[in-house]
Amino acid sequence: MFLVGSLVVLCGLLAHSTAQLAGLPLPLGQGPPLPLNQGPPLPLNQGQLLPLAQGLPLAVSPALPSNPTDLLAGKFTDALSGGLLSGGLLGILENIPLLDVIKSGGGNSNGLVGGLLGKLTSSVPLLNNILDIKITDPQLLELGLVQSPDGHRLYVTIPLGLTLNVNMPVVGSLLQLAVKLNITAEVLAVKDNQGRIHLVLGDCTHSPGSLKISLLNGVTPVQSFLDNLTGILTKVLPELIQGKVCPLVNGILSGLDVTLVHNIAELLIHGLQFVIKV
């Protein structure tokens, strides 16, 4: 009986202690276990919680490569631009003896330009007083590239810009004209007798209507003089510049990287379309 009574007293004391402890706060880290994946948030920078999306690095899908034909077209135009510049195109344009060509009628005093100049100088005496016409500040602008509808040819647009300094004492100061002209070169792929593939130059000429001449600065001359001078330049300049650019393009094509030539030629021979930005 004494043993049973002692157990009853002990159980009562334990129940009383448990009731008292239930009202006290639990020590840090001794809380009841939480369900899986619901752990307490971690503190970050003055109590801010770290969002789940910023907690772990996310896998990033690799970027898709560009279309190979886009890269091929860019490499081709870059090679042409670099070849024209390294071939001295800008210096060649600056050294064109434009006044001598105009006065000689393009090397043929009996030709169209020579006859035209003779008529103009007789009707507009100011043209006789031209002391010099100098090409300055030649620029090679960004090349354009398109493919023929059948896929067998490329057409390269070579845009040029330059300034003409016209020295005329009668006018009273230097007259400057801004000139823009596009040369268009046709490129084809051919196979020789040994089966080797080459890129060759087809037609190469100035684009009709692409020549633009405008008064840049200087004393405004008599309008008839400006019109007649522009008319002469329109007859002379395109063929002069074309004669300098086209041989350079032909030489560049023959010296292009073999792999680049092969890749482009294969597409042209089979008529496969490039993805080319105009």
Swiss-Prot record:
Its main location: secreted. Repeat repeats lie at residues 23-28, 30-36, 39-44, 47-52. Detected in airway epithelia (trachea and lung) and in bronchoalveolar fluid (at protein level). Upper airways, nasopharyngeal epithelium and thymus. Highest expression in the trachea and progressive decrease from proximal (bronchial) to distal (bronchiolar) airways. No expression is detected in the terminal bronchioles, respiratory bronchioles or lung alveoli. The keyword Cell wall biogenesis/degradation does not apply. It is found in: Secreted. Residues 1-19 form the signal peptide. GO terms for cellular component: extracellular region; extracellular space. It holds the Pfam family LBP_BPI_CETP. Belongs to the BPI/LBP/Plunc superfamily. Plunc family. Lipid-binding protein which shows high specificity for the surfactant phospholipid dipalmitoylphosphatidylcholine (DPPC). Plays a role in the innate immune responses of the upper airways. Reduces the surface tension in secretions from airway epithelia and inhibits the formation of biofilm by pathogenic Gram-negative bacteria, such as P.aeruginosa and K.pneumoniae. Negatively regulates proteolytic cleavage of SCNN1G, an event that is required for activation of the epithelial sodium channel (ENaC), and thereby contributes to airway surface liquid homeostasis and proper clearance of mucus. This is BPI fold-containing family A member 1. It comes from Mus musculus (Mouse). The gene is Bpifa1.
